[in-house]
Amino acid sequence: MAENHLHTAPKFQAVVRAIPDHPCTIQGDRRYTYKEVDERSNALANTLLANGIERGDRVAVMERNSSEYIESYLAAMKLACVPLNVNYKYQPEELRHIINDSGASALVIHEDFLDVLKPIRKDCKNLRQVIVIGKAGKGDTSYEDALKASKADPDLPWTPPNNDDVLFLLYTGGTTGFPKGVMWGPEIYDNLHLLLAPMIRSLLPKLSSAPPELFAPRSGKKSLLLSFLQSGLFRWLISRPRVQKRLGDRIEQMMQERYAGPLEKAAERAKGLRKLPNHTLIACPLMHGTGFLSAINVLASGDCMIFLEGKQFDPAELWRTVERESVRSIIIVGDAFAMPLLDELERGDYDTSSLVLFNSSGVAFSPRTKQALLQHIPQAILLDSYGASEGLGRSEPVLSSDGEVPPMKFRLAEHMKVFDDNDEEVQPGDSAVGQLAVAGLIPRGYWGDEEKTRKTFRTIRGRRYAMIGDMAQVNDDGSIKLLGRGSGCINTGGEKVYPEEVESVIKDVPEVFDCAVVGVDDKRWGQAITGIVAPHEGEKIDIERVLAHCAEKLANYKKPKELFVVDEVPRKDNGKLVYPRIRELVEEQRQKSA
């Protein structure tokens, strides 16, 4: 059996042994320690085991951010099963696809979403067990009843979790219009330092001129370390390239030990948090890669994760939580989250002095938003993460002392390249457009789709890369300029939407002959789904009826914001859509209706 020190379950339990009474999850008045989360996930695992779950079975989770979400994933992992995400905004047809595509044997679902499950449940042949967070119906098990089982480690009749297992499936939008499962393995821990270490290295030179608020005491108590960091001696030392290199090397080594080292290293790191607690507020949904991979990091480190209580994003609740819990880092998704937060900061009076890190993943902060955040929170370090279910990267950090705030910037590195059509590296200053390639922190492939796996995960000169279609150029200074997804993927508020799925739903309306949707620039959402529709000859299209049909068949974020009627949708002779002309038509129609 492969050594299992990388697998989440044993890593988590090593942290539990080290800091059983340390807070693990906080959501309003609900607080669970590492020991309590461990016991609750053990009980859930034993309930699944008693109801016929088997090694390698898939366990789907359809829930908002909560401790129950984390516990459900841990329970599945302890059984050497494969947890997977279900977007809680999905409609019945989308839920049916994921349950059947994954072959899920069990589903943990919040009672709010039972109406989505009800009409398609009979079509989910492999689904044997449904556990309901809230009130359960006949034949199902309530989550609280499931927790009444034994809290001891599950007595497995099969091989325990190991590094050969699939750790979890992350379902994401696919180019065919249906979500596809991306397989992540425990080796994710081997490569987390590739995401974090370059960011730390690029931060070190900036510390010599960092704002003094960055090193201000958070608890009102000064320490020798903080006094040193505030001193002129530290600023002089950290300005020296040799010191930056040696310190960067040491930090990278510590990160490798933290994530991929023996279990005792995880326990050692966790014990250190008693002196420096790090509360991370995960404001983006756990059902997406950004949220869940952040949670994985927290669990491996022995930190505490905090969730908001409301069913809808509430900026005032977030700032109250930051103040009440002395939050040190926040994970959100771009301007769609940040702009309402800024508006609330303008209206209210909140203590944000505890904040150190503001991270956006999936959608970058605009420079204007970064500038505004730093004006309100001068001690914060701002980060943009290149986020996709198939690979991750992190931008250079931005501090208030940087002056003019730049747009998101990534740099060529060992784990991040740009390749042209001949698999040659695009060099700095070359005007060529290539495809961004990410190595290291990448998944194993797509669930049940070997062809797409071969196309997306390619080995070039002995190194495996994820190439998901983001086109890019390399600037003179080695920074990477992202140009957009070659496949036409629309990124709206951090949700990735592929045009083909929306178009196929629109075409179900009898009066619609042809259609196309694109993403147009939107101040809040990054991109807004907008489209054109052409009627059958002699027919008239009722736009409100089309939008209502989309609302019935698609998650709300996939519904077009605007649709316009045109005589004909531009296509090439081979039938392919002419997207440049489609965008022109959309803009023309928007200007007419303005």
Where do the protein language model's features map onto the residues?
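Flexible, low-complexity linker/hinge segments
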Residues: 1-6, 141-166
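AMP-binding/adenylate-forming catalytic core of the ANL superfamily
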Residues: 68, 90, 96, 107-109, ...
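Conserved pre-ATP/AMP-binding loop-to-beta segment of ANL
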Residues: 152-171, 178, 201, 265-280
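Conserved AMP-binding/adenylation subdomain of ANL enzymes
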Residues: 190-279, 288-329
